[in-house]
Amino acid sequence: MLNSSDILSAAELADSAKARQKGLAFIDGSVPGYALLLGSDTTKALPILESLTRQQIVVFVVEEQLQTNIKESGVSLGWDAGIIPLTMIKALGCIGRVAQTFGNVNEPDDVMRYSRERLRGFTLLIGESTPERLELAQAALMMGCPLLSDNQLPQSVNEWDKSADYRSAIGGVDLHDIVQVGIEERGLQIKFPLPELPIAYSSDFSGQTVPDDSCGSCLTGVELVVTGENITDGRINIIGLDIDTVKGNQSYAMLIEISGREMQPDFEPVLERQIETIFNNADGIMHRGQRAMVTLRIAQKAIDKGLRLRHLGEVLHAQLHNEFGNILSRVQISIFTEMSQIQAIQEKAQSIHEKRDQRLGNLRDEDVDTFYTCNLCQTIAAGHLCIISPEHPGVCGAVDWMDARAAVSIQPVGSNKAVVKEGLLDAQIGQWESINQAARQESGGEITAYSLYSLMEDPGSACGDFECITAMLPLSNGVMVIDHTYEGMTPSGMDWAMLFEMVGAGSPTPGFLGHSKRLMGTHKFISAEGGWRRIVWMNHALREELRPMLEALANKEGVPGFVDMIATEQNCESEEEILLYLEETSHPVLMMEPMM
């Protein structure tokens, strides 16, 4: 059997220029890896070759008869084509030469180690597993190439080296899936070109709006990312009418199923929040919101040019691979406009999102030494920045402390950054010098100080995806809270649209705060001003939705029946009416110090 000395001898004879050329592509990531192809069945080999080369994987065809058959079928062979006819020892020698050149290693063990860790490959055996082929495949395993075959493999492969974190040999793999399994076993990061689109796609378009008079289709609904099993990479399912048929307002749902060796449930919300950034780079598309409060507005001009829901799925598939190929290897997307299907996704999403929200348990800000920033929404509000702690989730409600921590573990240099709490300035309002410094840097100077716990002094900013607005009501010495679904006027004399203009541009406004619903269930919600005790008015639907959360807080502090002390549009339309209601219910705000 071939050994490491044989491979190094072959490396000395390898074409230096070709090894350097391909080696550079390995190192810069433009070539994700290589495959060693064994077998003689040309009919089976051709679609595999097409799949490998389409994904920029270099193929070494290592059997002479297969080389001849492929050439006779009209397929170009050679270094430029990425399908290279070499014997197994010469192919491994070429990889060894790349390791020597770019890894600056020469000892056999060092060359083998560099090849396994940095030059990732796998062996494909199409056809009969003869002793000679198995011997060649076992030699390739030294370089980090597991064997995959469409046929069952003999028991002898069970004795092969199993010290790596990938399987050494896998038999009985479906030919349609064999390349994907190889990619997953060795963790190759495939770069996908942007699909052909009828519209322009560039970050230059992020932040654009699609007003009513130019909107061809306005979709509202839910988006969900889950870790899936037995999914097909690149499959795009459209269930229901497409946007060329759907006019005006329409419900919609999108289910994105992800799998990969490094994928885990904690990463799901991180990927979920990337949908907005990916879609907003398309000319004529405006995406706002997350979870079950998504709005997707598509301009009529984009529809007229031929844009369809399938294009959105294709863009999402490619960009998720390109941005997060280090954790995922398969992305399957289903888009629904059929109402019966949408309801099923909504129910599934609600259950999953509730479980995600429970992960933090009783973790408090005082229990951790690191907070996180999130600048994901700066494409729609340039100066905006979220500071995320266990008791201070992002204003969108979709990114909490665990999500941000997971995002940093995936992409250390990305939309989220870790900030160590240092230089406490004021514990009551929640200010630290290190947090202020991070806020100044990442907001481009728009935010000079950031209070996590105060409504009145240096409150945080908001973008366009916040769920609620809290605003001071001076006469009642309290605050009102409304959510985006409320269309009526508030006791402040402003409706949601007016309040949105005040808080939704990325600049902090004392006395006004855009935030998530989840924030109201924490002990740190405007705690500098007294917290939940300050709430004197809410729109009725929001009050009832958050009743369990607010009752739990109030009961724990010895204020039973607190939620019914909060006025709504059903009994109070002005601040004067609120004040009378507070006196009738003996609201605790009457005993509190003035906010101003």
Language-model segment annotations:
Residues 1, 22-35, 54-55, 119-121:
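A short, charged/proline- and glycine-enriched loop
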Residues 1-29, 105-106:
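Short N-terminal or domain-adjacent regulatory/targeting segments
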Residues 3-17, 151-596:
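Cysteine-centered metal-binding/redox modules
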Residues 32-33, 113-126, 148:
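Extended, intrinsically disordered, low-complexity regulatory segments of metazoan chromatin-modifying
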Residues 33-45:
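Short, glycine-rich nucleotide/cofactor-binding loops
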Residues 42-61, 136-140:
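Histidine-anchored nucleotide/phosphate-binding helix
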Residues 57-69, 79-86, 148-151:
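Short internal beta-strands
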Residues 69-104:
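Long, charge-dense
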